[in-house]
């Protein structure tokens, strides 16, 4: 089967149950430095956070319908920090007035035995990848620029291969339900990143 669409959010702490507002795009490797320079000028006056994470995507197939998907992620830079378990709900794409994709997001810290727990619960690891990049912040908005690599040997994060010749760029906000005005702020910020990157409201179902 084709892998579910990737969404990259580094292990930097999580909120229990919020709505995620999301815009996505990509930038070619040769244009990366120009984008990073633009982000340094537009975002808060602080150094971006570097991250290198290993994510495992688990599926639990039910009697009918789509499988239940959970994402387990750990930091490769600091193995002592907790794992993170993430659930992303179905996107609410029907409202054309929203400038961003909106979906429920549940994010909790977990112990290092998380993979064993998921296996015991009947989940099957579908695929894994490594994400390396930087996180910029602009108020409540977060911009993640990351290079995604496939893991060639299961569990061996030292043996990877880039998925593409580009970087994934994600602009997101975590907020309580009903805070749709943040999508207008996101749209305005995304306009300032053109033409280096075009951030869009992407329906994951179109990519399946």
From Swiss-Prot:
It comes from the Eukaryota. One of its GO terms (biological process) is positive regulation of transcription initiation by RNA polymerase II. It is found in: Nucleus. Keywords: Activator, Nucleus, Transcription, Transcription regulation. Its main location: nucleus. GO terms for cellular component: core mediator complex; mediator complex. Disulfide bonds: none annotated. It holds the Pfam family Med18. Transmembrane segments: none annotated. The keyword Transferase does not apply. GO terms for molecular function: transcription coregulator activity. Component of the Mediator complex. Component of the Mediator complex, a coactivator involved in the regulated transcription of nearly all RNA polymerase II-dependent genes. Mediator functions as a bridge to convey information from gene-specific regulatory proteins to the basal RNA polymerase II transcription machinery. Mediator is recruited to promoters by direct interactions with regulatory proteins and serves as a scaffold for the assembly of a functional preinitiation complex with RNA polymerase II and the general transcription factors. Belongs to the Mediator complex subunit 18 family. This is Mediator of RNA polymerase II transcription subunit 18. It comes from Danio rerio. The lineage of its organism: Eukaryota, Metazoa, Chordata, Craniata, Vertebrata. The gene is med18.
